[in-house]
Amino acid sequence: MFIDSVIWIAYKNKNDSWHDKAKRLLPTILQRTRERAYVTDYVALETVNHLLRKTSFETAKETLEMFTRSPRITTLYNNEDSFRATYDVFLEHPHLSLTDANIIFHMARLRERTLFSFDKGFDAVKGIMRREDAPAQ
């Protein structure tokens, strides 16, 4: 399963409109499932930079450490080939950001269908099952 930036940002930012929902969702999906949680380095970058602007250095640092140290989270790193493939996905989906296109690329590469996100723009992407709710126990 992939987890989009908007979930991490809402979870860590008390002033975010999705904060309460993310506070219920994220711990549940990380504790109840045995699935690996994936983020990309683009998601980490987008999340940490947003938190640095909207919250504090400490919050941004804690989040970066969570991405790099948690045994439940795998961060996928990009190279020149993945950047070029992401660019192609970006051109196919003009309603999504470059980070979103990168998530789509990595999901296709890993044949992963589940994405936790509050971003309804992903609903238009064939093959992705966007979720806002926790999996059943």
Where are these regions (language model features)?
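Short, well-structured N-terminal submotif of metal-dependent ribonuclease cores
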Residues: 1-37, 53-62, 133-134
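Active-site flanking residues adjacent to catalytic metal/cofactor-binding acidic residues
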Residues: 3, 40, 118
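Conserved glycosyltransferase catalytic-site signature
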Residues: 5, 41, 100-101
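A general alpha-helix detector
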Residues: 7-8, 46-47, 85
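Short glycine/serine- and small hydrophobic-enriched flexible loop segments
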Residues: 49-52, 108
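Active-site neighborhoods of divalent-metal-dependent phosphate/nucleic-acid chemistry enzymes
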Residues: 74-114
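Acidic, PIN/NYN-like endoribonuclease modules and their adjacent C-terminal/linker elements
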Residues: 104-105, 109-137
